[in-house]
């Protein structure tokens, strides 16, 4: 067992590191001993690189771990023997703590065998390896690692009391001038071995850290090299693409040049063909001129005859087309010219527009466009109220006259295409009425009239048809002069349109009743009230809902289509003659 411990490099390193820690922490160390250890540390740094030392330490550590696993069983017994011997040694050293002694004398006594201590106290130390073996192992470890491991608190504070380590150097080299007391020796335990194995990972960890840093630097260098290669590869590909693009551009330039040459060649060929054709034509003309005889005359006469036949056929077709166009134009002309009733309607609608745009100007409604509209329609209808009332009076007279139906068949001037009797005047009036309705000028005028009324209760008796002759009193408002005039204007309007509806057979069931109603309203009372205004508004709404104006327009259009055209009558007269 002792032979295995003496041959183990781990045990020698343990003693060398323990001596270094004792040297760093004990105040009794002599300068000579420090000089000796300094010489050993300087010898360990002889031209060895850090990588070689780290590799050697790693190999020795692997050997130590292998031997440790092999000697676990034997070391337990040795530790028990060491504990027993150290107990005896501590008992024998206690009297010598206060006695002056020197390390040199102790070393000499131990070397000569005349030590007063029992032999069993230093028996394990005599089996330790030689100082040269410890020195050789210390040379393999860098001085910076030894100093760092020796200076750590974890190494120096493994036990509460420092354990004396015998000097590994020969006694003749140790010289101590001042005597120092030997510190008490506590029984060492297995912590001494643990302290060694705790120190080994610190060296190994630094070596591993250096290895990691070196491997990281190598990895980073490899990555940079790969990136550099990738960039070079991309650059090479870009250069290849550029070369290919230049080659393509040159090819395209060549193709364009060849196409230009081909186009120029084709143009030259076409010009040559044209020149050849012209020469042929000239030759044919010369040949025709040279020919003489009757054949040419016969051919020319036949061609002329065929041409004349073709011209006659085309002339007949053109004549038919002209007749159809004339017929369509006559029909269009008849439809574009307004009848007398339609002309009266156009005039009355102009009066309506002139009146309400004048009221809009008077009351400040649509002030931006009202003056221009009032000026335009006033030129076409200077007296709107008088014209509407006169038209209503004529309608009243015609409704009483049974022969008034012949009025719609009055003569029509077909030459009046550019005057007031064409359909454009009707279209302009309809557009003006739609503009008036969209701007709600009529509603604004009615609202202003309602705001200007004076409240006056008028006892107005209204007979109730459902009350069997009973009468009831309803409050009514007296209207102003402007509003009374407006009500009279609307009553005349309703009278005129219902009179025309009666004449043309539009809404036969109610037309007669409405005509008599508005005739009685317009001539039956001397004073107009708010009830009359409401009745007039209801009458206008009824007129719009039933579409009386649209029905009258369609009836007049049907009458125009039924009238015979002047050209047809002329054809009949020619046929009779």
UniProtKB/Swiss-Prot annotation:
Tissue: Expressed in the mature region of the primary root, tips of short, young lateral roots, guard cells in the epidermis of cotyledons and rosette leaves, the socket cells surrounding the base of trichomes and hydathodes of fully expanded rosette leaves.
Entry keywords, A to Z: Cell cycle, Cell division, Cell membrane, Coiled coil, Cytoplasmic vesicle, Growth regulation, Membrane, Phosphoprotein
Phosphoserine modification, residue list: 130
Coiled-coil boundaries: 206-337
Principal location class: membrane
Polar residues: compositionally biased ranges: 15-28
Phenotypic consequence of gene deletion: Defects in seedling development, root elongation, leaf expansion, flower morphogenesis and fertility due to defective cytokinesis in epidermal cells.
Stretches the record annotates as Disordered: 1-42, 67-214
Annotated protein name in UniProt: Coiled-coil domain-containing protein SCD2
Organism: Arabidopsis thaliana (Mouse-ear cress)
Gene field: SCD2
